[in-house]
Amino acid sequence: MFRKARRVNVRKRNDSEEEERERDEEQEPPPLLPPPGTGEEAGPGGGDRAPGGESLLGPGPSPPSALTPGLGAEAGGGFPGGAEPGNGLKPRKRPRENKEVPRASLLSFQDEEEENEEVFKVKKSSYSKKIVKLLKKEYKEDLEKSKIKTELNSSAESEQPLDKTGHVKDTNQEDGVIISEHGEDEMDMESEKEEEKPKTGGAFSNALSSLNVLRPGEIPDAAFIHAARKKRQMARELGDFTPHDNEPGKGRLVREDENDASDDEDDDEKRRIVFSVKEKSQRQKIAEEIGIEGSDDDALVTGEQDEELSRWEQEQIRKGINIPQVQASQPAEVNMYYQNTYQTMPYGSSYGIPYSYTAYGSSDAKSQKTDNTVPFKTPSNEMTPVTIDLVKKQLKDRLDSMKELHKTNRQQHEKHLQSRVDSTRAIERLEGSSGGIGERYKFLQEMRGYVQDLLECFSEKVPLINELESAIHQLYKQRASRLVQRRQDDIKDESSEFSSHSNKALMAPNLDSFGRDRALYQEHAKRRIAEREARRTRRRQAREQTGKMADHLEGLSSDDEETSTDITNFNLEKDRISKESGKVFEDVLESFYSIDCIKSQFEAWRSKYYTSYKDAYIGLCLPKLFNPLIRLQLLTWTPLEAKCRDFENMLWFESLLFYGCEEREQEKDDVDVALLPTIVEKVILPKLTVIAENMWDPFSTTQTSRMVGITLKLINGYPSVVNAENKNTQVYLKALLLRMRRTLDDDVFMPLYPKNVLENKNSGPYLFFQRQFWSSVKLLGNFLQWYGIFSNKTLQELSIDGLLNRYILMAFQNSEYGDDSIKKAQNVINCFPKQWFMNLKGERTISQLENFCRYLVHLADTIYRNSIGCSDVEKRNARENIKQIVKLLASVRALDHAMSVASDHNVKEFKSLIEGK
C-alpha cells in the first residue's frame, strides 16, 4: 500500500475525443435519455468511483461494447452495462457493498479521512495481452468511423490536448486520483462545465461545453457555429437543468486545511466549490474492461509511450489552457473562481454571437440553469473602427518617429566622427611629443634626488650657520655696548666732578650717596679719567698731524678708541668664528654647498624643461635655497667698518647676477628676474636690522654716514623690494628709529652752570659744557642725515622737538651773547635740510623752529643793548652781528622775524641779505 499526498484535488474528467464523436452519432435517442458522451454516468460527487478509489462495477467479464465501465455510452449505445433504457444512473449506485476501505473504518467521518488518505491495491492482470491488442484494434476502427465528427469538434478539442491515439493524458496515473497541481486552471474550467450538466438521467448536456473550449484568439468556423446553435435549441426544448446545489449530499468537499468549518453546516456547504472525480482515461477503461482493477496505470504508459511523448503532452496541455490564473488569496472554504474577462475584442462578436464569462456560484449562473437559457452579455470594450485617416495618422507618426530617430543617429554619427578626428590628432601629437619623455623623466628624477639630498644637507648645516651668525652678532654687540657704556661713564664722572666744584658741597670722605665705600669707586673713576685724557691727547695729536686742529671743536669727535686688550680679544673671537664658518661644509661635496654648482643644476632645468621648471615654482624657492649659503658669506660683513666690502662685489652676488638671463625674450611674469632683489629683501635687510639694533652708534658720524649710505643704495638700487610697503623694510626702519630714540634718552646730557662759572674759558666746567653742547649739535646733524629716508614729521620730532628745543636751546640760554652764540646758531642751522624751507609759503617758518627764531631775535636785541655806550669798533661789530642774525632768520624762512629785527635796528640791506641767503 502506498500513502499519497494529503492535498488531493478530485475533479471530473473532460470528455474525450471518442465520447464527442459517439455523442454526435447518438443524437437520435429520445430526449429523456442522457446525452451521449457527457459523462453523466458520474454524478456530481463522482459516482463512478468510491471514496477508496475503486470501481463501482463488480468484477466479471463483459463485452467491451456494453459492459466496460470506462467506455460507458460510447461503446454501448449510450446505456451503462446491465441497465435498461430509462434507468438513468441507478446501476451506478448499486455496487456500494464492494467497497473494502469503508469497512476498515468504523468512524463516522471516514469519508473525509479517506479523501485525504487513499489506499490503492495493485492487482495483477489475469488476462493476456492479446485481449488488450484486440481492444485497441476495435478502438481504432471506431476512431476511423467518427473522423468526420472529430473535425467538427476540433475547436472544442483544442481545449484538451490529446495524444496520437486519442487518449486523454492522465497526469496522475500512479496515484489513482487526479492531483491537479500544474493544471489548476483546467480544473476550474472543468468545474464550471460541471455546473452546467444536469444531475438526472434525462438532463441534456450544456450547449456551452463546446463554446467554453474555444481558444482565445481562435475564429470559429461555420460548422462550430451550426453545432452551437443546434445544442442551444435542444437545451431550450429539454429545459430540465437542475443546479448542483440541490443535492449537496452527493458532493464531496476537498479541504486543504484541517481547520475549515464543519461539513454539517449548510452555509459552508453552499459556499464550497463542488468537484467531481475525473472520469477514467481510455487506458483505464480498457484495463477495467479486461478485468484489471486497481492496476498500476504506469505500466501501460510505459509500454505505450516514452518519456518524451509524455513531456510533449504536458507542454500541449499547458499551451491549451490559456486562461488567466485564479486569485490566490481566496478563502479556503469558499474557493470561488472568477474568470477574468478578456480585454481584447472577442472574435465571436463578429459572427453575432455575444458572450461573456460569469463567475461560478453567482446569481446569474443560477438563473441560467433554472431558465434553461444561455444569456450572453455584449462586451463593452468594442474595437475602434479603423479608418484611412487613422491609418494615415499612424503612418505619419511612425514616419516622424523614424525621422527623429534618424536625425539623432546622424548627430551621434557626426559626433563620433569628430571624436575620431580629435583622437587621431591627439594620437599624432602625443606620438610626436613622446620622443623626449624618457629623457625628461630621467632628468626630473635626477633633479628630484638632487634636491632631496640638498635639503637633507641644509637641514643639518643650517643650525650650525645660525649659531655662527648669532655668535658674530653677539661679538659686535658687546663691543658697541662697551663703547657706549664708557661714554656714559665719562659723562657721569665729569658731571659729578664739576657739579661738586660748582656747588661746593661737602661730602662724607668715605661714603657715596648710597652709603657705599667711595674709595673703590674713586679708584675706578681715576683710572677712567686717566684713560679718557690719554685718548683725547692721542686724538689731539692726530689732528695736529693732519692740520685739522684749527677747525676742530671739542665734542665733535667720537670717542670710539679701544684698548689693545679689547682689540686683541675681539680679533681672536672673530677669527675663531671665521674658521668655524669655513668648516661647516668641509664634509660636503662641492655640488651641495657651492652656489655656482647649485645654480648650474637649476639653470639646466630651466633651459631644457622650462614648463615643468615654472610649474614647480623653482623661481620662488631659489631665494630661500640660497639663503643659508649667502648668510654664511655675509657672516663678518658689517657696513659700519671702513674696510667693509660691498655686498655687490661679493662672489655670491656676481654668481647670481645673470641667472635666468638668456638670449630668448624674457617673460613679464618671470620670477627669476627678481632673484637678486628678493635675496636683498630676505638676507640683506634682516642683516642690517640686526646691525642697527646692536652695533650702530648714532653719536658716531662715520657710522651714521655709512648706515645712511647703504640704506640709500638699497632704496635706489632695489626699489621693487626696499620701499615703505615692504615688511622687511618697515622692520629695518623701525629698528633705526628705536635706536635713535634710545640714544636721545640715554646719551644726551647738557650741564647747567652759573654764568660766573663759565666765565673762565679754561676751567673744567666750561670745557665740559662746550663738549656736551657740540656733541648735541653733532647728534642733531647725525639725525638729520636720515632726511629722505624717514618722513619729515618723524625727523622734525626727533631732531627739533627732542634735541634742539629740549637740550640745545637750554645751552644757548646759558651761553655768552656774542660771536660765540652766533657761531653756534650758524652750526645748528647748517644741520637743517634746505628742502624743509624751499616749499614754504608765506613769511613764517616751520612751527618747530619758532622757539629757535625767538632766541635769535632776543640775541639781536641783547647784542644791540650791549653795544650802546661802547666804542665805534664794538658798535660796528654789534651791527654786523645783527645783520648776521637777520641772515640766519631768512635762511630758515622766518621772514617775519627777520623783517622785525631789520626794522628795529635800522638794517638797510635787508633785501640783499634775504637774496644772499
UniProtKB/Swiss-Prot annotation:
UniProt entry tagged with the keyword Cell wall biogenesis/degradation: no
GO biological process, one term: positive regulation of myoblast proliferation
Ranges for region Disordered: 1-123, 143-205, 229-275, 362-381, 530-564
Record's compositionally biased regions (Basic residues): 1-11
Keyword Ubl conjugation: yes
UniProt keyword list: DNA-binding, Isopeptide bond, Myogenesis, Nucleus, Phosphoprotein, Transcription, Transcription regulation, Ubl conjugation
Broad class of the protein's primary localization: nucleus
Localisation per UniProt entry: Nucleus
A GO term, aspect molecular function: DNA binding
Cross-link (Glycyl lysine isopeptide (Lys-Gly) (interchain with G-Cter in SUMO2)): K149
PTM sites of type Phosphothreonine: T563
Entry superkingdom: Eukaryota
Glycyl lysine isopeptide (Lys-Gly) (interchain with G-Cter in SUMO1), cross-linked positions: K149
Known tissue expression: Ubiquitous.
Biased composition (Acidic residues): 16-28, 183-193, 257-268
Phosphoserine PTM positions: S16, S154, S155, S158, S191, S262, S295, S557, S558
GO cellular component: cytosol; nucleus
Biased composition (Gly residues): 40-50, 73-85
UniProt-annotated stretches for the region Necessary and sufficient for interaction with PAX7: 378-558
Bias-annotated ranges (Basic and acidic residues): 161-172, 234-256, 542-554
Subunit organization: Interacts with PAX3 and PAX7. Interacts with WDR5; associates with a histone methyltransferase (HMT) complex composed at least of RBBP5, ASH2L, SET1, SET2 and KMT2A/MLL1, KMT2D/MLL2, KMT2C/MLL3 and KMT2B/MLL4 through direct interaction with WDR5.
Stated family: Belongs to the GCF family.
Function of the molecule: Adapter protein linking the transcription factors PAX3 and PAX7 to the histone methylation machinery and involved in myogenesis. Associates with a histone methyltransferase complex that specifically mediates dimethylation and trimethylation of 'Lys-4' of histone H3. Mediates the recruitment of that complex to the transcription factors PAX3 and PAX7 on chromatin to regulate the expression of genes involved in muscle progenitor cells proliferation including ID3 and CDC20.
Protein name: PAX3- and PAX7-binding protein 1
Upper taxonomic lineage: Eukaryota, Metazoa, Chordata, Craniata, Vertebrata
